[in-house]
A protein has these predicted regions:
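Phosphate-binding/switch loop-helix module in NTP-utilizing enzymes
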Residues: 76-105
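Short beta-strand-centered segment that lines the nucleotide-binding/catalytic pocket of NTP-utilizing
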Residues: 30-44
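Conserved small/polar residues in nucleotide/adenosyl-binding loops
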Residues: 184-191
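ATP-dependent NMP and nucleoside kinases share a basic, alpha-helical "lid"
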Residues: 94-145
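P-loop (Walker A) phosphate-binding loop of NTP-binding proteins
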Residues: 11
Length: 195
């Protein structure tokens, strides 16, 4: 079985997960989702107080070599052991997810299109964008509700790393996408259905 790999990139809070979930619903049992966030490097040797200060929006924060290897293995029909990232600990957990190949593989992450090795493995490259104000509001809501973070920490991280890295590394990858989806002006579920 030759899988189709669809990459979904875009800034933090742009609507990537919403778009991914629409595609997941559309494809049903034929799809599996891999999150680039799960490939953040282990931070075992760094105290928690220092881990919260790590720049997780820089390409070097991710173990992209492992993701590339895993995508190749899935395309070859092999099962992978995907790492699991724990947002509350700012570190990878000891758990792994057993992921079996499916006809459609969705890969999601802010820096997904920044690495040419990943881009070369993607059959369709999607960039999801939204207005900066919408993105920060969505990020605050998500990080407080789903990740148990405090508002001051979210704002500090946004101003020191998320925003500058977005303009330096994330936004330029829009030009590498086959399709750009705007959550400000376009209903994502319509785009997902047409994809």
């Amino acid at each position: 079985m030759e899988s189709i790999i669809i990459g979904i990139a875009g800034g933090s809070g742009s609507g990537k997960s919403t778009f991914t979930n629409r595609l997941k619903k559309h494809f049903g049992d034929d799809v599996v989702v891999i999150y680039h966030d799960n490939y953040y490097r282990r931070q075992d040797g760094i105290p928690f107080e220092e881990r919260v200060k790590v720049n997780y929006d820089h390409p070097d924060s991710l173990e992209t070599d492992l993701l590339v290897e895993h995508l190749k293995e899935l395309r070859e029909g092999k099962t992978i052991q995907c790492p699991v990232y724990d947002y509350s600990q700012h570190n990878r957990s000891d758990k792994v997810l057993k992921i079996e190949p499916r006809p459609v593989i969705l890969v999601e992450g802010i820096l997904l299109l920044a690495d040419p090795r990943i881009r070369d493995l993607l059959d369709i490259k999607v960039y999801v964008e939204a207005d900066a104000d919408e993105r920060i509001l969505r990020r605050i809501s998500r990080d407080v509700e789903e990740r148990g973070r405090d508002l001051n920490g979210i704002i500090d991280q946004y101003l020191t790393t998320v925003k500058p890295m977005h303009y330096l590394y994330v936004e330029p990858t829009r030009a590498k996408a086959d399709i750009a989806v705007s959550y400000t002006h376009l209903r994502a579920h319509e785009t997902a259905a047409n994809l």
